Amino acid sequence: MAFKEVVRVAVTGGKGQIAYNFLFALAHGDVFGVDRGVDLRIYDVPGTERALSGVRMELDDGAYPLLHRLRVTTSLNDAFDGIDAAFLIGAVPRGPGMERGDLLKQNGQIFSLQGAALNTAAKRDAKIFVVGNPVNTNCWIAMKHAPRLHRKNFHAMLRLDQNRMHSMLAHRAEVPLEEVSRVVIWGNHSAKQVPDFTQARISGKPAAEVIGDRDWLENILVHSVQNRGSAVIEARGKSSAASASRALAEAARSIFCPKSDEWFSSGVCSDHNPYGIPEDLIFGFPCRMLPSGDYEIIPGLPWEPFIRNKIQISLDEIAQEKASVSSL
């Protein structure tokens, strides 16, 4: 099969559930399109070789035409060698009784090593998508340990939050999903994220005007989006996997296969942002792709006092997380 190009891709956490779902979407063309081949490297920590071999067998058995090359590895340098894109999914999950600070430090060590390996082995313009939580801070740690790579190309995944809000607005307004646009998530991927309904449009009109229920928007919608991950865990006993995988595929596709004037939310480096957010943070902003192939943070969006206050709370949390891992 003739490809427009072959994309070298690394996926970490290869034996986990999010990666398991994501890998088949990747091989099917849901991430880079159906005209790009994929040179895929699947990584997980030493001791997972048998599980990785099973994942490889299933991908082989799928007979995916776009899967140009496939290998599994427990070496970060091998996984990241010459890559165009990395999806950093693997992370330590938060266990019973674990403090958030402990989680930050444990994952900080993981993403320090991954960032250093990216710095050594990846292409300088490689695009890095971080999924493992706490995702904003993990992304910042990886970025700081990979100074050779462009800071603008590090993304912390907020697309699942965006999708959750998108779906909730469509259900409330009783309209198809395609009628909802300009769904924006600011700040941290946590219970202090800021789902900004004031920017959203339903059938081209302001969502607040169409919904007509400010109390529902401020209290029910915002709270539901902020806490959806916990609600999923409580309901099914496991964290989101299939929906997270789909969100990751869409997040990458928005960058590699952009649609005209599509808005997407991503945690990106705050350097030179148009909203006065301090620099050297990974902060959620609304973005869109430019003809040059770069993205821009969409400028000039007004913040109502309700949204501004919540953005400050989310910003404070990100700054505190950064301070707690700066020694790494």
Swiss-Prot record:
Active site: 189 (proton acceptor)
Enzyme class, first EC level, given as a word: oxidoreductase
KW Plastid (keyword) present: no
UniProt KW keywords: NAD, Oxidoreductase, Tricarboxylic acid cycle
Binding sites annotated in the UniProt record for NAD(+): 13-19, 107, 114, 131-133
Domain of life the protein comes from: Bacteria
EC number(s) per entry: 1.1.1.37
The reaction(s) this protein catalyses: (S)-malate + NAD(+) = oxaloacetate + NADH + H(+)
Keyword Nuclease: no
Biological process terms in GO annotation: malate metabolic process; tricarboxylic acid cycle
Gene3D superfamilies linked to this entry: Lactate dehydrogenase/glycoside hydrolase, family 4, C-terminal, NAD(P)-binding Rossmann-like Domain
One Pfam family from the record: Ldh_1_N
PANTHER family according to UniProt: MALATE DEHYDROGENASE
Entry similarity comment: Belongs to the LDH/MDH superfamily. MDH type 2 family.
Function recorded in the entry: Catalyzes the reversible oxidation of malate to oxaloacetate.
Identification of the protein by name: Malate dehydrogenase
Organism: Chlamydia pneumoniae (Chlamydophila pneumoniae)
